[in-house]
UniProtKB/Swiss-Prot annotation:
It comes from Streptococcus sanguinis (strain SK36). Pathway: Pyrimidine metabolism; CTP biosynthesis via de novo pathway; UDP from UMP (UMPK route): step 1/1. UMP binds at G54, D74, I135, G136, S137, P138, Y139, F140, S141, T142. Belongs to the UMP kinase family. This is Uridylate kinase. One of its GO terms (molecular function) is UMP kinase activity. Residues 20-25 are annotated as: Involved in allosteric activation by GTP. It is found in: Cytoplasm. ATP binds at K12, L13, S14, G15, G55, R59, N163, Y169, D172. Homohexamer. GO terms for biological process: 'de novo' CTP biosynthetic process; UDP biosynthetic process.
Length: 241
């Protein structure tokens, strides 16, 4: 068996990744394929946590700009992340991976409350843990959730699984054909250059807690496993190069 580079990871998925080609909603076949990819990594003995965005179902900022109360808009988005978490958990269970959903907002009928010690025990027992409802407070993104939960569970790396984007560039490669991809960056580089991998709160949390980020294209089958076993794909962000 290949020895994985990372023993404990947090995979950050965008909500749009669950929507497939439709771009909105949840495409069950797409989620099932992703579950198979995650299972491949789980079979290597890697401990896995997940944070999934909610942008396929709801976006708080545009709703607030249209006149909705921002706090209510953000809470609505948090519920969207729980919907995504439950669907992913079911798909993982169906491929034979024991999975738990923990939410930052209590909803005992559908998920466990987020309790760090319990999450760690689940990971140590080989269960996947999906963190839903953000951090339970408005104004904080699911990127910040990923960085915070990674620090709390002492993850070795955050895998930023991007939809059709194969790394970090100095400009938008879809708009600028001269854009150059970075293979490696420091967290300080990301912040000083204003590169939008995560929001600034999440980037600072990752830097302060010495957590590696790997940004890669999740649409390429097998890429999650390639990252975990240490193949050079995408862009790696760390404190030390």
């Amino acid at each position: 068996m290949v020895e994985p580079k990372y023993k404990r990871i947090l995979i950050k998925l965008s909500g749009e990744a669950l929507a497939g080609e439709k771009g909105v909603g949840i495409d069950i076949q797409t989620v099932q394929k992703m579950a198979e990819e995650i299972k491949e990594v789980h079979d290597l003995g890697v401990q896995i946590a997940l944070v999934i965005g909610g942008g396929n179902l709801w976006r708080g900022e545009p709703a607030a700009e249209a006149g909705m109360d921002r706090v209510q808009a953000d809470y609505t988005g948090m519920l969207g992340t729980v919907m995504n978490a439950l669907v992913m958990a079911d798909s993982l269970q169906q491929v034979g991976v024991d999975t738990r959903v923990q939410t930052a907002i209590a909803m005992q009928q559908v998920a466990e409350p987020y309790i760090r010690g319990r999450a760690l025990r689940h990971l140590e027992k080989g269960r996947i843990v999906i963190f839903g409802a953000g951090i339970g407070s408005p104004y904080f993104s699911t990127d910040t959730t990923a960085a915070l939960r990674s620090a709390e569970i002492e993850a070795d790396a955050i895998l930023m699984a991007k939809n059709g984007v194969d790394g970090v560039y100095n400009a938008d490669p879809k708009k600028d054909k001269t854009a150059v991809k970075f293979d490696e960056l420091t967290h300080r580089d990301v912040i000083s250059k204003g590169l939008r991998i995560m929001d600034s709160t999440a980037s600072t949390l990752s830097m302060d807690n010495d957590i590696d980020l790997v940004v890669f294209n999740m649409n390429e089958p097998g890429n999650i496993k390639r990252v975990v076993i240490g193949e050079q794909i995408g862009t790696t962000v760390s404190n030390n190069l």
